[in-house]
């Protein structure tokens, strides 16, 4: 086991804070409408230019192991915020840095770290409750477009195209983002169905850059049982090999010899194939397989209705224009089922939903209806160069996540104003001692940090702007885009409540852990000079003369 280096107390905290600052300072320059770009070096190809906080955070690794631990913990904040709400990563990083910086100062001054953490936690709980009170529903197209615009760095075209997509396929509809061929963004709405099952083996992946499987004009085999014996699939595979078309297998499971053979055939290019598990469980799985069959014009191979997999032919298979499979979900686009049958199936599900007494069943039936009747909207991102395309695509994806979050939990005033208002409205949070009270103050002070950073990035003095906003009421705030003050909602500067809430909760959670850190352990750094001595062994070549 390698020797370890151990740091205690203030030595550990100073190193950790240095790492936090390196990562946070790199990320926070991107915040706000006048945030700057960060250029990331890539081992091959052109460098990546981005304003996406989590993309910057993921690139940072520090040489000093103790500083790196601090940086990695803040990276976790950005990743968690991104996973939960798909946006707000920079806000979360700025909040975490502010809480850690103030918290470690208080610890150095002799305050109890555990009480500070409890105070911070109490303030955050109160703040989240107050955020819910401030939140307003985001239902109309205009509000959705404004949220998308803000998240896409004040690019109105992106906000509008997302709002249009949501209008076309419904708020529950499926919206995907692709790289387009034109200079402008385009919106395509395609009939399709998505379900939450990914590929059964990563060896099916044929688009390594996105980690997905894409099948063009595939046959779709639907089986209501586990498939483990490859003999059952041979007649279908032989028929397919003659057509040269790909195959998607949707079954209860595909395992053992069957899965291994499919993977080998796919890798050798004999048959293009991918397999996914059928969505749902029990009776719901049977119903969803039937939905897919009607959508694609296929038949579900089920022994209970006298159909055996070995006797299945190509006529029993469904077809679609395209299928996209990621590790988490499968999207069937443009199924070739009969329109009349699809409408009849939707009407049947609608009747079931109306008759159902269970809220859960009702929700699931409505979900199935949306998947059958709704479509898939594809936003094709247009740009002049590949570098710009990648940067723009990341912004569109961020904006899409933000609008979904806004529809889910509503919106609050943007530009860091909501957190400032929340901090001023939280009255006396109940605390047990002075250290906890200081923890509350740390959290409330940190809630001003995003506003200060937005102002700083816009070339203004953060403290002056924060003071002006604090003196206002309601949605009064600072519009960094055009350097004016006014009602943020009227100016169309909105943040999804979910994004702001997630950023605050994750930042305080990780910051609390860092404040209560007393010891850090890392491998001792091996001295490069010692390792270099091995080079002398090259002289051993002379031993050839001994023969």
Swiss-Prot record:
> What name does UniProt use for this protein?
Chaperonin GroEL
Q: Name one GO biological process term.
A: protein refolding
Q: Which organism is it from?
A: Shewanella halifaxensis (strain HAW-EB4)
Q: Which GO terms describe its molecular function?
A: ATP binding; ATP-dependent protein folding chaperone; isomerase activity; unfolded protein binding
Location relative to the cell: Cytoplasm
Q: What is its EC number?
A: 5.6.1.7
Record key words, sorted: ATP-binding, Chaperone, Cytoplasm, Isomerase, Nucleotide-binding
At which positions is ATP bound?
Answer: 30-33, 51, 87-91, 415, 495
Q: Which CDD domains match?
A: GroEL (cd03344)
Superkingdom field: Bacteria
Family per record: Belongs to the chaperonin (HSP60) family.
Q: What gene is this protein a product of?
A: groEL
- GO CC terms for this protein? cytoplasm
């Amino acid at each position: 086991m390698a020797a370890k280096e151990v740091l205690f107390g203030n030595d550990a905290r100073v190193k950790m804070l240095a790492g936090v600052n390196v990562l946070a300072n790199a990320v926070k320059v991107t915040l706000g409408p006048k945030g700057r770009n960060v250029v990331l070096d890539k081992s091959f190809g052109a460098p990546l230019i981005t304003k996406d906080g989590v993309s910057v955070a993921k690139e940072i690794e520090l040489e000093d192991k103790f500083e790196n631990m601090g940086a990695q913990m803040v990276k976790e904040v950005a990743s968690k915020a991104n996973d939960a709400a798909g946006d707000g990563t920079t806000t979360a990083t700025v909040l975490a840095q502010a809480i850690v910086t103030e918290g470690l100062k208080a610890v150095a001054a002799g305050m109890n770290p555990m009480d500070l953490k409890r105070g911070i936690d109490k303030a955050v709980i109160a703040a989240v409750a107050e955020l819910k009170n401030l939140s307003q529903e985001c239902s109309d197209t205009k509000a959705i477009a404004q949220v998308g615009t803000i998240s896409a760095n004040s690019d109105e075209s992106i906000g509008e195209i997302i709002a249009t997509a949501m209008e076309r396929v419904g708020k529950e509809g499926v919206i995907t983002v692709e790289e387009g061929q034109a200079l402008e963004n385009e919106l395509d709405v395609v009939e399709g169905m998505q379900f939450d099952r990914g590929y059964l083996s990563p060896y099916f992946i044929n688009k390594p850059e996105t980690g997905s499987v894409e099948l063009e004009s595939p046959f779709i085999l639907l089986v209501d049982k586990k498939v483990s014996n490859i003999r059952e699939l041979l007649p279908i595979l032989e028929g397919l090999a003659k057509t040269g078309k790909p195959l998607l297998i949707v079954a209860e499971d595909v395992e053992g010899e069957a899965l291994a053979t499919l993977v080998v055939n796919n890798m050798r290019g004999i048959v293009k194939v991918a397999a996914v598990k059928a969505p749902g469980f029990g009776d719901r799985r049977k119903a969803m397989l039937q939905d897919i069959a009607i959508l694609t014009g296929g038949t579900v191979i089920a022994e209970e209705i006298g159909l055996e997999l070995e006797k299945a032919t190509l006529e029993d298979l469904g077809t679609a224009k395209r299928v996209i499979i990621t590790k988490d979900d499968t999207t069937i686009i443009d199924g070739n089922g009969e329109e009349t049958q699809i409408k009849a199936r939707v009407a049947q599900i609608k009747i079931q939903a109306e008759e159902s007494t269970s809220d859960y069943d009702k929700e699931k039936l409505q979900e199935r209806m949306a998947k059958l009747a709704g479509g898939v909207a594809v936003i094709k991102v247009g740009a002049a160069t590949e570098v710009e395309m990648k940067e723009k695509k990341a912004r569109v994806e961020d904006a899409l996540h933000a609008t979904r979050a806004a529809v889910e939990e509503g919106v609050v005033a943007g530009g860091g104003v909501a957190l400032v208002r929340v901090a001023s409205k939280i009255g006396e949070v109940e605390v047990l001692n002075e250290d906890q009270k200081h923890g509350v103050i740390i959290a409330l002070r940190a809630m001003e940090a995003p506003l200060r950073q937005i102002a700083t990035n816009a070339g203004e003095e953060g403290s002056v702007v924060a003071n002006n906003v604090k003196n206002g009421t309601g949605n009064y705030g600072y519009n960094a885009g055009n350097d004016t003050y006014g009602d943020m909602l009227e100016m169309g500067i909105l943040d999804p409540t979910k994004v702001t809430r997630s950023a605050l909760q994750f930042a305080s959670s990780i910051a609390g852990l860092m404040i209560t850190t007393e010891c850090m352990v890392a491998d001792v750094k091996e001295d490069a000079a010692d390792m270099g001595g091995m080079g002398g062994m090259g002289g051993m070549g002379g031993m050839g003369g001994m023969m």
